[in-house]
Amino acid sequence: MSKKKGSLSINSENIFPIIKKWLYSDHDIFFRELVSNGCDAITKLKKLEMMGEAEIADDEEFKIQILANPKEKTLTFIDNGLGMTADEVDEYINQIAFSGAEAFLEQYKDKTSEDQIIGHFGLGFYSAFMVADRVTIETLSYKKDAKAVLWDCEDGMDFTMSDSDKADRGTKITLYLNDDSVEFANIFKAKEILDKYCSFMPVEIFVSDPSAEPEYQTIMEEELTDKDTVIEHIVEPAKTEEKEKEDGTKETVEVEPEKKKVKILKRPVSISDTTPLWTKHPNECTEEEYREFYHKVFLDYKEPLFWIHLNMDYPFNLKGILYFPKINTEYESIEGTIKLYNNQVFIADNIKEVIPEFLMLLKGVIDCPDLPLNVSRSALQNDGFVKKISDYITKKVADKLSGMCKTDKEEYEKYWDDISPFIKFGCLKDTKFCEKMSDYVLFKNLDDKYLTFKECLEENKDKHENTIFYTNDPVQQSQYVNMFKAEGIDAVVLKDSIDQPFISQLEQKNENVKFVRIDADLNDSFTEEISEDELKDATEKLTETFKKALNRDQLDVKVQKIKDEKVSSMITVSEESRRMQDMMKMYGMSGMDPAMFGGSGETLVLNANNALVKYILANPEGENTDIMCKQLYDLAVISHTPLNPESMTAFIERSNKILEILSEK
């Protein structure tokens, strides 16, 4: 062909500055785009060969080579795919083939949000100009009698086309990096980026530095293949030893035979796992493979609890693996990672428009060929197809969890403490997930037995219908726990911060059901009857005595005959008041006066059956009454919640004082 010059066919010269600035939020994305193009060229050639429209040698090995040359400041991408003719270069490269280019420029020239532009109009190849001042393409089509073409473009607009001496089918793209982008010619940087985007592409990918000193390896002669470049043959002579025979004479014996080795150029190693685990059928995968894949991809030394293998062909193509990681405490970070792929090409992490928000606590990979490589999130938000994908993933996770609970509840219970924050969060965030999982949410009771919501209601049905008692700290609230156990009343343990909004949701969905913390009130199950006159007299006297001793005029005192005589005092806080206080803490309002919202709800309960309380009642002006009142109050608080540092110091000093008083008697 005669040499051809021209400018890229677009009605504005402003396209490449816009591409450079806004098309991609990550400038290293050009690696993915160019490698993906090469992968597509190979895939299309394979399909043409299957249809009898192309011929491929039986021993052909498809691959993509990347040459990172820091000395020349170049990056070269080579594939042995279907290549292009001069006409195809003119059509696909010289003409930026999308409609409405002027409208596109008008819409985006003043925009500053890359989300509005990413992935529009399929401009993948042109991402090369984000990092290169000059790009060349050498290509030879698979078509019979095709001639090789050289395309050369500087500054992203003016190009020349001419014949090339390229003899092998495929495409070679060379980027002459600009001064701001020479780091990409470093082989270690190139490998890092390729590992990010191309670790699982279906074609082998090899990276090398042509300017580096060659590396060698030594193999046995029988391991030599036609692909190896031989440097030299090495013969290691047989090893012998001198041994004494029975008659006392000595002889030389061969202990190791002669070894024939070959020194060769170091064999290249592909950075791509062409058949990642998610592409296989679940029946073909072993537990060990699932665990190895998890450690490799997520660099997590801990073992995953279990996993879900997604494998769907209709009504859309979707494959993937979701792992449930082990979380040691609720304070440990539970931020997961869901990697999204398109035909084994990495797109992005944690795209919430595709992956339901609550699944972001998991770790996994999702591969959906029907999603574009580059797509604006604003477009995804209103995409019905994407909503179907999200709903399907949610359904599969719910099916796995509910199925495990139904078929192997013991195993499900073993995982429950680790997965409960995830499931509860899912129920709060996703209505459909909540509907599927509501019968499989478990609550651990005081005997470490796991119960469903319905079973919890059955436990106390005879004594407290539609009430579920709970404790958020069984150790701190052990006095209350012991009283509940003594009366045969069950309670569940709710330790996680997500439990409060979760039980509020359950109460909204089940209007007659109430969750009540075990220190909210002392009901008739724990007390004996007391006459009104006795109650009134004791309450008035003890209230006056304790208010004076504690110097708290607003103290709310309640006198009851608690069955357990050893219990002297307790603190109760109404469920409504406590939830209000929790909400205030959550929203940073803990410094505000609870009285603004109806008081603290805290009540000091004194046991009229206890000897110490009886003594104070009989001796309101006694020598030690003041110190006893303070001590009983702090003991009540300690059984309810930790003392603050100042109160704890006073409690310790007072305890020492009481011991001194006792020692003097």
Pin down the residues of each PLM region.
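GHKL (Bergerat-fold) ATPase N-terminal catalytic module, capturing the glycine-rich phosphate-binding loop
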Residues: 1-184, 192, 199, 220-222, ...
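GHKL/Bergerat-fold ATPase module in large chromosome/replication-associated machines
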Residues: 117, 135-158, 178-182, 188-665
